[in-house]
């Protein structure tokens, strides 16, 4: 699966290249949202209560309904730019995981292979980002985003599985989702309502270090792997 640092670096790349003019708070909320599922242990139990495999809560099969729920919230909007950005970051995290080989049921159940693949994907993602090789795409507004993700996931699992296939679909899918649901701020300074919502989401409480890193595009993430 993708490491937390890879989620952070990809979401930061999207902010730097698609929404460089957004406020630091809005960008930080998005980037923190993109790593929050990895540091929230409860998310790994998604699906377990229904008798499915334990600690597979980030797997595509277990997270499909939750992604659809997040999508509906984002489509409805009206929640302020900080909360919108945070939830969008969470959706981007799960979308990226959906196109990661070990997060699909077709991956062989072998811990050694899982760890080896994680390292290989981490190196591949770093190499691609360092060489500025990131697909930033969009789709027509009339296309249903949930149906589109299901369609490209079907195509994804039918192709040769590996780091290249993962990365190509991950970067396409997360940029499409971000472009669809990004909410442009009407003013450059976040409102008090947005700040209050950020506090409600525990953004500055549970990840003040991560937030500082997320808000500084030039800082390498530390302590997150």
Show where each model-derived region lies.
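N-terminal leader/auxiliary helical segments
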Residues: 1-90, 95-225
């Amino acid at each position: 699966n993708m490491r937390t640092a890879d989620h952070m670096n990809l979401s930061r790349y999207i902010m730097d290249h698609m929404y460089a003019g957004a406020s630091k708070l809005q960008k930080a909320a998005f980037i923190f949202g993109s790593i929050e599922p990895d540091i929230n242990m409860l998310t790994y139990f998604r699906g377990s209560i229904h008798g499915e495999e334990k600690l597979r809560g980030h797997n595509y099969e277990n997270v499909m309904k939750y992604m659809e729920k997040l999508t509906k919230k984002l489509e409805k909007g009206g929640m302020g730019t900080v909360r919108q950005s945070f939830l969008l970051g969470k959706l981007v995290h799960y979308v990226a995981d959906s196109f990661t080989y070990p997060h699909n049921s077709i991956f062989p159940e072998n811990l050694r292979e899982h760890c080896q693949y994680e390292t290989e994907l981490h190196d591949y993602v770093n190499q691609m980002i360092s060489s500025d090789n990131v697909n930033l795409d969009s789709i027509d507004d009339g296309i249903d985003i949930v149906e589109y993700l299901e369609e490209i996931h079907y195509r994804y699992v039918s192709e040769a599985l590996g780091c290249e296939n993962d990365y190509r679909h991950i970067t396409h899918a997360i940029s499409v989702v971000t472009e669809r649901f990004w909410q442009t701020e009407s003013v450059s300074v976040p409102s008090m309502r947005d700040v209050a919502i950020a506090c409600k989401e525990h953004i500055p409480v549970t990840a003040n270090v991560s937030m500082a890193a997320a808000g500084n595009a030039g800082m390498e993430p530390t302590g997150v792997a």
